[in-house]
Amino acid sequence: MRANLKLALARGDFDVVHGFEPGVPSLSYVALTTTDALTVATFLSAARLGYPPSRARRDRFRARVDALLATSAETAQAAAERFRGDLTVVPLGVDNALFRPAEKRRCIAVELEPAGRGVTRSMTRLVEQNEQWELELVHTKPLGFRPSIPRRLRQRVHIRRGRTQAQRAEILRAASLFVAAPGGEERLALEAASAGAAVVETRGRRLRDVESEVSGLLGDDAAREARAAEGLSHAQDESFDRLAADLDEVYVRLAGKRRARRSSGSDDPLGGRDWIVVDLHMHTDWSHDCSTTASDLLDHADAIGLGGIAITDHNVFGGALEAVELARNRRLVVIPGEEVKTDDQGEVIGLFLREEIPRGMSFSETVGAIREQGGIVYLPHPFDRLHAIPDPETLHRHVHEIDVLEVFNARLLRDSFNDEALRFARKYRLLQGAGSDAHVLQGVGTGAVRMRRFHDPEEFLLSLRTAEILRRPKSLAYLQSLKWVAQVKEKVR
């Protein structure tokens, strides 16, 4: 089943995949974590949020879901605590035309659930005391038990099947009162309200309080009708039409964040230019954790055949300026950049910068500072969960401001981190970048992009449309050991 679902999702070319109740092991969870389409998750119950159990898996799930919805404020609050994010409350949905009010009988409809046996017995006692009333016990699932009905009440107490909407509508349209079972189906109570029944909730209440409330409503027609009118008004706001409109708004909003589909084939605006290999992420000795000089870096890049490099030191810009100056008489393209540490949302690289950007600003402020210089926003290693990264809310909120997403970083410990970035870039049709994140010469070029030669930021973005990601990984342990040795030597000096 799982394999068939994954195959269908891969071949379907869907714009949006919408899963319901993914907080339990289900095909919805599989679909949302497998597809490359835009994803929406709807939570229907605060009691169905236990999966996945580990924080790491919940974070991965959250990163793959683009919009979180809930059908009640209670469920939204519980899901937000579990999955960390803003949830939109949408209607549960009810067919107001099918579940429309009709002529009422003196009948109490009670949801029949194992957890509600006490409610069933209590309502049976009330019907016995009020001879003009009938009781209908409605089951929407196969019965695992059968309540005992006293012989003297069998003309007024009936068990009714409510497996289909039509069956439930017939029962609820005639009922004057509906009593929900503790932990029962929220939709059934909504259908009862739409059908004009006065609804009595039992969840979290003492049985004697419920019995007292129902007893009062049986003898007070005006109170019962007022309760029914209030419920009907609420049910009309929860219609399927309203739900469809809200979901359409969510889908359109998500689709609006995605870049326009680029044409394939011969669409190469820089087709007359030569191909070069460009490493878009590396460091010099201006970074606190690197001892490679800009001069050595340029010589090595030339020696291994790179056509371009981006100097992206940590929170400093001097190394990039030095490299640009040293490269003036070389054919090697040097992009001046900086890897800027935000306050608490990871790092953002600015490419084609003119001046240094201070660390410690918010993600939004950092992106704005890059934009003010006419720079390009390049997001490095966005899913490297072993380091500080943007949380899913920040990533989704600012996706339209990301010019290039790094889908391959040669220094990441796990391939899955790069795979996650590639999935995200494909979903939103972002331009893809790659870099070595080299801190030693031996790492330079282990991640790069094959692209057309460019001369300015605009041509750089045009060239990335037809670029190819190059993966040339070397042992991370080997590269890390070289970095540590170089740092120790620097300290000894």
Locate the predicted segments by residue:
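A charged, aromatic-enriched C-terminal amphipathic alpha-helix characteristic of glycosyltransferases
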Residues: 221-258
